Amino acid sequence: NKTVHSTTERALMCPSCGHVIYPRIVPAVIVGICNDDKILVTKYRTGFAHYALVAGFTEIGETLEETVQREGLEETGLRVKNIRYYKSQPWGIVDDILAGFYCDVDGETDIHMDESELKLAEWKTREELELQPDDFSLTNEMMLMFKNGRM
C-alpha cells in the first residue's frame, strides 16, 4: 500500500500494518575557528565559489563537539579548543540540520589545507572578511557576527 502522512507526528505511515517511517535527519557542523582577531575562511575545491567556514557531517557515534574537532583537523590541520555552540539552522533543501560553533585555535596556527576538499584556507581579520550579499545562511550569519565583533 501507499504510505500516508501521519496525523499525529511528522512521519509516514502504512495504513495496512501501521508501520511508521520517520524522516532521516543528517547533522552537520559549521565551525568558526578564531585566532584572536582573525577567523579561518575556506573555499571549496568545487561548487560554491564564496567564502565559507570549516564544515562537515557528524559521523555515527560522534558528538557535535567531536565533529568540530575532527573537521578542523581534517580540513586545515588545526587543533581547536573552547568550543562554543552558536545556533542551528535546518537546511530545507535536503535533510540536514546545521549546528554552528565558534572555537579557538589550540596551539599551532599554520594551516595545512586538505587540497582534495578545499582550494583556499586562510586567516582573515574582521576588516578583510567579505560577506555574501543577501545571504541568510548560518555560515554568512556567523561570519557577520565575527566581522561585527559580536563573537
Give residue ranges: language-model regions:
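Cys/His-coordinated zinc-binding microdomains
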Residues: 1-2, 18
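N-terminal strand-loop-strand
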Residues: 8-53, 57, 79-85, 103-107
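Nudix hydrolase/Nudix homology domain
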Residues: 48-51, 114-151
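Hydrophobic alpha-helical positions that pack around
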Residues: 68, 72
